[in-house]
Amino acid sequence: MVCRAAVKIYDKRQDKEMIIPCHRHCDAFLILKEFGYKKGEDFKEIEQGFLDEHDRFMSRIAAWWEAKNCNQFTQAYKNELAQEYYHPATPRQLFSEDVW
């Protein structure tokens, strides 16, 4: 189950990868800014994705399939999918607006 958005970064200050959980991906960058981090100088963005109920990081594509399998899409997003043609095996990316 998709539980929250997350951004994986490489923290140059601490010399390690970190995952920042958030409601929307842009919130992670606001959090970093609040702590005085500057993109490129203090951290490098690795990937935007989501966390599951076990705090495992998923790519946007893996999270889309997880949300689909767990029936988590908003009704508006389900309606949008019904209006467009897409092949069920075509990889899609999940955006937080699709699930909450």
Residue ranges and their predicted role:
Residues M1-Q48, D52-W100:
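Linear-motif-rich, low-complexity cytosolic tails and juxtamembrane regions
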